[in-house]
Amino acid sequence: DTTEFKYYELDANGALKVRKLYLDPFMDLYNLEIISFSISPTPSAESILSAQQQAIEKTADAKYRRTFHSDRGWGYQMRTYQYNLKVHNIFQSMSRRGNCLDNSPMENFFAILKQELYYGNTFHSYDELKMAIENYIMYYNTKRIKEKLNWLSPVDYRLATTAA
């Protein structure tokens, strides 16, 4: 799934301009860890495919059948996206038409990210917002605990369950 953020920059004439940034993350539903992501100034196939490739590489040694789930956005219906999954023996799952609940884990992550990082703050450049999102994802994965994960962070939960 892709989500949009806005930031505000002064143009060459000193006028305030609203700009946008797009985040394309991939989440492991086992522990809710963001395993890859890409950030771009425009919604693009390149951004989605970059995050997809990172997710493919990160899960390459998985001992279970990999399934990549997404909403029905244009980027996840691209032939290249689907081909990349097929070549790596990854099953594709897509939300049912008109059913946002099928993608609720990612939508929940977006809500948490925006509530804890974005709302109430003003960002004045692409780089400032990009760095804040990157730092937040690191925090979310390694420090932010979840009741659902026995009060562990996603990374700590993964490490605890794989060590057992």
Indicate residue ranges for each PLM-predicted region.
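Charged DNA-binding/catalytic regions of mobile-element recombinases
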Residues: 1-164
